[in-house]
């Protein structure tokens, strides 16, 4: 199953989770207030200082370019990040140029993640770091709206999560 099909299937759960009354994993049901805002995207370039030197066969570095992304919706903020290792061919300039072309205020529902992805794809191809940063911020935001971390939304056990920060080559 590819990512889009998974998100479509998971979307059914999101619709249920975003209904006016949802059951919390702990405690009594909580009532969510109706939301009528627009999405507001902001971003800021950042030079991330690494705690340890990152070494590859051809290079070594102690910093990495980064763009911090925020999507605000009705007083809640979802955070994302575009990390651009030099060997992937993206830069702070390419990411900020792409993000500057986005107008997320046309969307009033942060749960419409697939539509937002389609919109981003229509703005320009590639730009994977920038698109990933928006995706991360949307998931952070919708998790906050549901008052649930995503591992719970997806029914995952965080103790069984594999390590994912490896570079092989």
Predicted regions and their residues:
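N-terminal secretory signal peptides
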Residues: 1-2
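Flexible hinge/switch segments at interdomain interfaces of large molecular machines
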Residues: 154-159
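Metal- or metallocofactor-binding catalytic centers and their adjacent structured scaffolds
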Residues: 35-43, 72, 77-146
């Amino acid at each position: 199953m590819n990512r889009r099909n998974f998100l479509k299937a998971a979307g059914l759960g999101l619709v249920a989770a975003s209904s006016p009354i949802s059951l919390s994993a702990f405690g009594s049901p909580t009532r969510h207030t109706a939301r009528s805002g627009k999405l507001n995207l902001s971003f800021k370039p950042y030079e991330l200082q690494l705690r340890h030197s990152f070494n590859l066969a051809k290079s070594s570095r102690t910093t990495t370019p980064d763009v911090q992304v925020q999507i605000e919706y009705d007083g809640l903020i979802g955070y994302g990040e575009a990390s651009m290792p030099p060997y992937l061919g993206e830069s702070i300039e390419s990411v900020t140029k792409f993000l500057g072309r986005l107008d997320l205020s046309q969307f009033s529902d942060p749960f419409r993640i697939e539509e937002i992805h389609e919109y981003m794809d229509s703005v320009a191809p590639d730009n994977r770091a920038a698109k990933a940063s928006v995706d991360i911020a949307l998931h952070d935001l919708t998790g906050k709206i549901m008052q649930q971390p995503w591992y719970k939304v997806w029914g995952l056990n965080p103790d069984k999560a594999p390590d994912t920060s490896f570079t092989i080559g």
